[in-house]
């Protein structure tokens, strides 16, 4: 599949109204890295002010070991604001700078998973898997299948945008349906359904890394569970699929009318190339066997009688599974790595071990912007903890919310709404969550809401506004795909196609989040809506 190249400059905006304002304001924002530089500067000034004014926060505590920065006296845990310019904090900043970065949980997780994912992507496994999933589909069931594949394509890194979305335009055209309908449905699933998936994957590992850093501000023992949102993200797929199906087939397609154009020679050539070859089918079969082998090994390490390195026998209940949950990062990596290798060998995209190493190198090289971002995000979160402003904001914020007696479903919907508002201007899910998590995660823990539930609410809000803003990083690319079929498509045209999806997702997502909390449904294996702080009275 030929990869389209996004325009070098932002798409010109001749529209007026709210969305045009969003685009103009968003274009004025600096790079996420510079946002964190400014946040760090603001935090340093705020720490001096807080220390001078004697800011503090307290809560009852009966545990053995208080969180870092807290002091226990007479059964009360107290945090006092500390200037980041104290001798001790300056020493941490300067001497421990490398350690602050290397101990940043999301960075290590992303680097490890990318070693496998980069091989799978560059060997062609993800592309072939997506193309194979769309072949020989009945015309009437194109849309629901596109929804399911689109929301699971998040495992395939950028392939969902670069391969799947333009391919859907081709597939719809080949089925005699309007290609823009296919592109819109695919974009709604891939981008608007960003929070949904059938199984946990790289995004879960990444976001829970930030959640863990934030949760440990008040509970140093809290450890992430990559499966902690599994049932929630699966429910998103179940909820969003009929919504996309209805809007696509009943609203958007009648509005666009029948497609009367003819694909040019380049598009016909791409349609021909989208066919999965016999070699690729054989490679997919071997990749499936490799994935099953990895799953079998990990299952054996957890279930084999007398030999269970992935089970903590010293714990009870679901706590025994903590090593298994943490080992899933390695499992994802090996599934991608071995699947990519056997597929690449089958289709001859990998001819030697040096090809595998080269693919890994290219994958890590593509993470350079993220590593730069991680340096500043790691220091922001660490300095938030050193200054004690994180737990102070969480404790006082939780106390204020308790006084208001607002129901938990409403509070989490507010988190979701705030996340979706930020998403209009800042596209990066990790950038937004790394800034929000140090405040909202511990605050909601003190309100009895688990880090997993707060993360789920954030993910829902971060998802649906992706398709409602021209600042989404792939928006110019999707617009370019549309213009290959209709050169008159503009920013307003694409937004008008995607807004019905975004609005429907917003209403349904808020209702689902509120219902999940109200009925206290489990979020995933070993993950619940509610939480109790160890040692808190």
Give the label of every model feature segment.
Residues 112-122, 130, 134, 140, ...:
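Helix-loop-helix module between adjacent transmembrane segments
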Residues 36-52, 110-118, 149-151, 189-193, ...:
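Hydrophobic core segments of alpha-helical transmembrane domains in multi-pass membrane transport
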Residues 110-111, 138-169, 174, 371-378, ...:
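Hydrophobic alpha-helical transmembrane segments of multi-pass integral membrane proteins
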Residues 13, 17-20, 56-107, 217-225, ...:
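Interfacial loop/helix-cap signal at membrane boundaries in integral membrane proteins
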Residues 1-28, 57-85, 253-282, 529-537:
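Intrinsically disordered, low-complexity non-transmembrane regions of multi-pass membrane transporters
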Residues 29-41, 45, 67-127, 321-391:
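Core transmembrane alpha-helical segments of multi-pass membrane transporters/permeases
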Residues 23-27, 163-259, 277-283, 457-459, ...:
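Membrane-core helix-loop-helix motifs of multi-pass transport proteins
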